[in-house]
Amino acid sequence: MAEPLVLNSVIGFGGAIENGLIAHPDGRTIIYPLGSTIVLRDRADPRSQEFLQGHSDKVSCLALSRSGRYLASGQITYMGFTADIIIWDLESKQLIHRMALHKVKVQALDFSCDERFLASLGGQDDNALVLWDVASGNAICGSPCNTNFTNCVKFFNNSPDKLITAGNFNMNVWTYDAGNNKLRPTDATLGTLKRVFKSVVVDANDEYAYCGTTTGDVLQIALERVLFKNTGPAKGNVQMGVTATCEVPTGDILVGGGDGSLQLLRKMPALAGTKVEGAITSIALADMNARGFTFFVGTAMCNIYKPATSRLKEELVQTAHNDKINGMAFPNEYSEVFATCGTGFIRLWHLTTCRELLRIAVPNLECFCIAFTTDGSAILSGWSDGKIRAFGPQSGKIIFTINDAHQKAVTAIASTADSSRILSGGEEGMVRVWRIGRTSQTLEASMKDHKGPVNCIRIKGSGDECVSASSDGSCILWDLHTFKRRTSLFANTFFKSVVYHPDESQLVTAGTDRKVTYWDAYDGNAIRIIDGSDLDEVNALAVDRDGEALVSGGGDKLVKLWGYDEGHCYFVGVAHSGAITAVGVTPDKQRIVSVGTEGGIFIWDYQRPQTLADI
């Protein structure tokens, strides 16, 4: 039976989830989702993290009780299935209740002021409002919402039996009738106004609700009679809609926009403003002092900002990929930094502190593969426009570009041991060798045998041989002196990844047939075939520098650590909520890094498998 792989730290933030960033009242912790995992992070130290794991799919919403004792989280699931709501005890970090009523998705959650009730809102396929008893985890009562879609739910701050919901052209104030065990709605009177509401905040005295709309205005609703009172900002609407709202202790309203703008409103005129990268999806008030207040802002670009004081001067606290990560790479014999690539960005990270060291932006293009030159002088990358771009690892400035390196996208790249040549693989099936001079990049050879995209290229330490893995069901070993095929490996699969054993006598491949196959590197015969996954394809492989352990990851979202010689899975890491696209073992054998389609970077403690010598 495989043991769990210990998750050391995570780089990532589910920025697209509305109100997904929460500041805990203890003054030390911020809470946010990443895929199916909930991260509890120390504000000052990004490496000080704890994880709540219990969801089977992506977390869709979070809510924290007023005292900070309880955390509720909802998830999204497959069509036709019920989505779980989990209540966590944050003191013990334990799961208290798991509740399921809503179909497909839990849209929003909120605790009552006395922490007795939890309100949950179903997604588009469910659209029901349910009231839960926090102590027992049982549903108390429920009601279908408006015929149109409802986006958000918020309890009053002083009345535990009153709450407000708002959505597409609808707004209701609900009162819980305990005697009859019913939720009774009151429609808001908005006159001729028609709005799609994205966020709701109730003021401290329960007098007014402030509702952000896709039109870009904020409506002030008098809650006693549920009547439209005022609108703002006074000097024009927020571009791309109001996506997040929050009341600060002074009674002013913080408004975040889809264009990344942040404004502080007092009686609807704007007092101050700033702009951040990405649509603002959550605003979390942290603390208040004599000079002003502190809060955190989460954006759809997966950035977390901390604008300090009432003048809104922002500081970037944390950043992450906002889309799938296609590849990752370590420099040769150096474990402190690693690079990742995805749509529009290459990022360089510091492993120990989990901080971004460098961000290279190439807008509107996707980077499919990344590698360091062996001497560490350049970051090599292959792009969707068929170009190979090399960047300086410290400056981020472009060193050279090979235009039209491939007819289609560049899907695989590698550097020889002397850094004098680059090998690249293309979506059209070509493997090309490039001579890199001081001022020139010359095509040495173009090897055409593959009929499908080249997904991975590895070069032998001596530099006289390489192997390319392709979606056409073949891996080809090439002689880099004659540029001819030495031998081929065939299987009924799309090969996704290939690695050499450190002694280079064997190759290991993985692909869509869910098998991990060992091959003799000289004659191309299969030596051993093991089941890499029970459910889905295996996308990524890595071997440690001594050849003791093999690490795999794929569509089953599991990181598996195998004993290389025995072919036995000793450790399994569970944290990803999307397919794993790349894995790597640090050269010092202390950590394993995995990246996936959810945009998260997961750092695991390396565990040495039991070898034949230990038995």
From Swiss-Prot:
A Pfam family the protein falls into: WDR90_beta-prop_4th
Localization per Swiss-Prot or TrEMBL: Cytoplasm; Cell projection, Cilium, Flagellum
CDD domains linked to this entry: WD40
UniProt keyword annotations, A-Z: Cell projection, Cilium, Cytoplasm, Flagellum, Repeat, WD repeat
UniProt keyword Cytoplasm present: yes
GO CC entries: axoneme; ciliary basal body; motile cilium
Ranges for the WD repeats: 54-98, 101-142, 145-184, 232-275, 320-359, 362-401, 405-444, 449-488, 490-529, 533-572, 575-614
Entry superkingdom: Eukaryota
Record keyword Repeat present: yes
Alphabetized PROSITE patterns for the sequence: WD_REPEATS_1, WD_REPEATS_2, WD_REPEATS_REGION
InterPro entries assigned to the protein according to its UniProt record, in alphabetical order: WD40/YVTN_repeat-like_dom_sf, WD40_repeat_CS, WD40_repeat_dom_sf, WD40_rpt, WD_repeat_EMAP, WDR90_beta-prop_4th
Record family assignment: Belongs to the CFAP52 family.
Cited function: May play a role in cell growth and/or survival.
Protein name from the UniProt record: Cilia- and flagella-associated protein 52
